[in-house]
């Protein structure tokens, strides 16, 4: 009876659970077989990571890299992306994995960009692109750009990413002269673009500004051209016009509407 119960319990386990049990016992090959049984299209990020770790244990570095990169198509769980990038870095050189191309990226932000770095590198790795990354210090994007002797220009990047957010706009909560304030703010950003192009050959990629959800005047805000909310919309529009083909804009306002703010 106990044997029958045990067999019944074993048969009810999912492939991933069986794989976990095998891996815990050190039976890595059996764990891989079980995990592969549970692979869906696309597999979960957790399962991709487990397979990558198993292949790393078996010194199959190429497969470890392949499954680490598969995390990109498996969801947006940050911890999985972070672990996947660390695992990929450990195994890529051992696997002698060739990169289709290599690019030097300078990441400048008005917020902490530490979490963005591994996600950016892993996503690029999935496309066969190796990123040599320069990360500016927290909130130092303007200082880096204005100082022609800064680490930014010494790095000589191919791409400069301006990862900035709405809180860094130099706009009041309400303005009696909204057109002038918008013009000044747009001029500040386009001036930074000009400095980058004067001191480097880098392509600029800038995040535009996601509008805040909670605003003091609520629905009335759209009737107030001098409100920060409406001025931010105007800045986004004007930056889009000014960018033309010279600067690539990431529409964070649209993305936040899709994903959440």
Q: Where are the regions that the model predicts?
A:
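Short helix/loop capping segments that flank catalytic or ligand/cofactor-binding pockets
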Residues: 115-117
